[in-house]
Amino acid sequence: MTLCFCGWLLGQTSTPMVTIKGGSYVPLYGVKGENKATKPVNVKSFQLDIYPVTNAQYKAFLEKHPEWRRSRVKGIFAQKSYLSHWKSDLEFSPLEAQAPVTHISWFAAKKYCECEGKRLPTTDEWEYVAQADAQNIDARKKKHYQEYIVRSMQTPKTYLQKVGNTPKNYWGVYDMHGLVWEWVADFNSVLLSGDSRKDKQGDDALFCGGSALNASDLTNYGAFMRYALRGSLKANYTMLNMGFRCAL
C-alpha cells in the first residue's frame, strides 16, 4: 500500500492517493458459473483518492474551466440543480469548503478527474475498496460492518460533514461509506428495469425488481442500495448527496 501525496501537503488541490493492490472479489450481481455461484471478478492494481473531491477543490477546477460553472454549463451535461447549493458560480459557505462537492453530474465528475490527469473509478474498483473495514480486505459478512453500513445510511445530512470524517479502511481510504454516494465510470452498466431483463446468463448482472434471488450476498444491504441507485441514474443527473473521487 503506497501513499502518493500529490502536493496535498504543499497547499495544492490534488487529493492524496493510495495504491490498491489488485485482487478478486465476488460482486453482488455478476455472471454465474456452472455451479450457479457468481464468478469472482479480477481487479487490477490501481490508485484511488483517499477522500472525495471537496467544494474547495471543485472551485479551483471551475476557476480554470469556466465552461463548467453553473451559469454556463450546458443542460445536456448537467441538470438545473447542478451546484445549486452554492451561492453563486464560485461562492459557497466557508463552512462547506472541505465538505464533499455534491450536485455534480457524471459528465462534470469525469471532466474534473481528466483535468487532474486521473479518471473515475470503475464499479468493480469502487466496490472492491468499499468491501474493506479497518482490518480486512473483505468484511462484508462481518456483523459490525453490516451494522455500520445501515447506521451510516440512517444518518441525515452527512454531505455537510468534512471529508475524512469517517474511519479509514484497510487500504487507507476514507469516506467510502457514511458521507455521500459516489459516481463511478460505468454506473450505467447496471440497469434498473424489469422489462429489459431477458432470459440469458449475461443479464444476471442486471438489477431489477426480482433479482435479489440472483444476488451473491443477501446480507449486503449497502450494495443493494448502491446498485439500485446507479441503475436509476442518467449522466446529467445531480443529487444533493452524490459526489465523487478520482482514480488512476
Put a short name on every predicted segment:
Residues 71-85, 127-130:
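Acidic helix-start/capping segments at beta-turn-to-alpha-helix junctions
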Residues 28-30, 186, 247:
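A generic structural motif
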Residues 238-248:
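Short, structured beta-strand segments at or near domain termini in extracellular proteins/domains
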Residues 20, 26, 86-231, 235-240:
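Functional-site microenvironments in short loops/helix caps that host divalent-cation chemistry
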Residues 1-7:
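Bacterial N-terminal signal peptides
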Residues 14-78, 104-107, 178:
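A short glycine-rich, aromatic-capped structural motif
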Residues 9-13:
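Boundary at the C-terminal end of the N-terminal hydrophobic targeting segment
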